[in-house]
Amino acid sequence: MSAIALGMIIFAYLCGSISSAILVCRVARLPDPRTHGSGNPGATNVLRIGGRTAAVAVLLFDILKGMLPVWIAYLLHIPPLYLGLTAIAACLGHIYPVFFHFKGGKGVATAFGAIAPIGWDLTGLMTGTWLLTVLLSGYSSLGAIVSALIAPFYVWWFKPQFTFPVAMLSCLILMRHHDNIQRLWRGKEGKIWDKLRKKKQKTPAEEAAELEEKED
């Protein structure tokens, strides 16, 4: 392994360790995603506790921190195996962030960003797979699981030299979704539409406060 490849792997891990969910929530003065909602510092949980704008910001930042290191490594002509390790390092940083006590998210958006530089055709297929699964099922987690399962086959079709690293990345994502898989199997996983409805609905405390104001 060259010094440049090693440097890019370390750089990718450090980029991944920047938890955009935590930072966006701090800037927007929202609850800490690690202690509210599902407890997962990711875009889906931020959607639950902070709404669409904050969730989109987290999603974009998470994609970029996976895409940027891999894109730079690609431009530096780093071999496919080390490109794959760079992608995995970015996801490991997101999952086990050194800046946030090694407690991070599940790495889906970061993995998507890391895979994107392989090709826009692959990126489109991955996006379509996730969207179709979510639209048909209503489960964001199922979209991530199905995408992770199919990703190595897509990559094998378009760029076979990246199949092994992407397969490793998919295994990492599936491992992080172990609890979601169990909840899906038991029928206890929450649908993304329910999260949006709950955000729009007022809490009993808010309704009581409004009644008090009317009485005054």
From Swiss-Prot:
Q: How does it sit in the membrane?
A: Multi-pass membrane protein
Q: Name one GO molecular function term.
A: acyl-phosphate glycerol-3-phosphate acyltransferase activity
| Family, per entry | Belongs to the PlsY family.
Q: In which pathway does it act?
A: Lipid metabolism; phospholipid metabolism
Describe, as the record does, how this protein assembles with itself and its partners: Probably interacts with PlsX.
An annotated GO cellular component of this protein is:
plasma membrane
Q: What is this protein called?
A: Glycerol-3-phosphate acyltransferase
Lineage of the organism: Bacteria, Pseudomonadati, Pseudomonadota, Gammaproteobacteria, Enterobacterales
Function (record text): Catalyzes the transfer of an acyl group from acyl-phosphate (acyl-PO(4)) to glycerol-3-phosphate (G3P) to form lysophosphatidic acid (LPA). This enzyme utilizes acyl-phosphate as fatty acyl donor, but not acyl-CoA or acyl-ACP.
Enumerate the catalysed reactions: an acyl phosphate + sn-glycerol 3-phosphate = a 1-acyl-sn-glycero-3-phosphate + phosphate
Q: What class of enzyme is it?
A: transferase
Q: Which InterPro entries match?
A: G3P_acylTferase_PlsY (IPR003811)
Q: Which UniProt keywords apply?
A: Cell inner membrane, Cell membrane, Lipid biosynthesis, Lipid metabolism, Membrane, Phospholipid biosynthesis, Phospholipid metabolism, Transferase, Transmembrane, Transmembrane helix
Sorted alphabetically, the Gene Ontology BP terms of this entry are: phospholipid biosynthetic process
EC number annotated for this UniProt entry:
2.3.1.275
Q: Where in the cell is it found?
A: Cell inner membrane
For this protein, the parts annotated as crossing the membrane are 4-24, 56-76, 80-100, 112-132, 138-158
The record lists the organism as Yersinia pestis
